[in-house]
C-alpha cells in the first residue's frame, strides 16, 4: 500500500509543484517526529534506572547530556552532508569537461 501511495504522490507532485512541496514538508515532519521518538526512547533507556515521581539529579543530567549529544551529532551530520553536496557539482562538472 505504501508503494501505491508513493507512486500516486509522485505522479500528483510532478503535475502540481505546490502539492509536491506540501507532500515533501509532510514527509519531513514525519521524519522529525520519528527521530524525536527514537531519541526519547534511546535516552530514556540509557538514563532512567527506576522511574519515580521526580527526576533525580543524575537522571536529569544524563537526559540533558544525551539530548545535547544527539543534537551535536545531528548538526555534524547535516554539515557534512551539506559539504558533500556542495562538492558534488564540482566533481560532476569535471567529469563532463
UniProtKB/Swiss-Prot annotation:
It is found in: Mitochondrion inner membrane. Transmembrane segments: none annotated. Gene3D superfamilies: Mitochondrial import inner membrane translocase subunit tim13 like domains. The keyword Manganese does not apply. One of its GO terms (molecular function) is metal ion binding. Keywords: Chaperone, Disulfide bond, Membrane, Metal-binding, Mitochondrion, Mitochondrion inner membrane, Protein transport, Translocation, Transport, Zinc. It is a peripheral membrane protein. Disulfide bonds join 43-66, 47-62. GO terms for cellular component: mitochondrial inner membrane; mitochondrion. A motif (Twin CX3C motif) lies at residues 43-66. One of its GO terms (biological process) is protein transport. Putative mitochondrial intermembrane chaperone that participates in the import and insertion of some multi-pass transmembrane proteins into the mitochondrial inner membrane. Also required for the transfer of beta-barrel precursors from the TOM complex to the sorting and assembly machinery (SAM complex) of the outer membrane. Acts as a chaperone-like protein that protects the hydrophobic precursors from aggregation and guide them through the mitochondrial intermembrane space. The twin CX3C motif contains 4 conserved Cys residues that form 2 disulfide bonds in the mitochondrial intermembrane space. However, during the transit of Timm8ab from cytoplasm into mitochondrion, the Cys residues probably coordinate zinc, thereby preventing folding and allowing its transfer across mitochondrial outer membrane. Heterohexamer; possibly composed of 3 copies of TIMM8AB and 3 copies of TIMM13. Belongs to the small Tim family. This is Putative mitochondrial import inner membrane translocase subunit Tim8 A-B.
Amino acid at each position: 500500500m505504501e508503494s501505491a501511495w508513493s507512486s500516486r504522490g509522485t505522479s500528483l507532485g510532478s503535475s502540481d509543484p505546490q502539492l509536491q512541496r506540501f507532500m515533501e514538508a509532510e514527509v519531513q515532519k514525519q521524519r522529525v517526529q520519528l527521530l524525536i521518538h527514537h531519541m526519547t526512547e534511546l535516552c530514556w533507556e540509557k538514563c532512567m534506572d527506576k522511574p519515580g515521581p521526580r527526576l533525580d539529579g543524575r537522571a536529569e543530567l544524563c537526559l540533558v547530556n544525551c539530548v545535547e549529544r544527539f543534537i551535536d551529532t545531528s548538526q555534524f551530520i547535516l554539515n557534512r552532508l551539506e559539504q558533500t553536496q556542495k562538492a558534488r557539482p564540482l566533481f560532476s562538472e569535471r567529469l563532463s569537461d
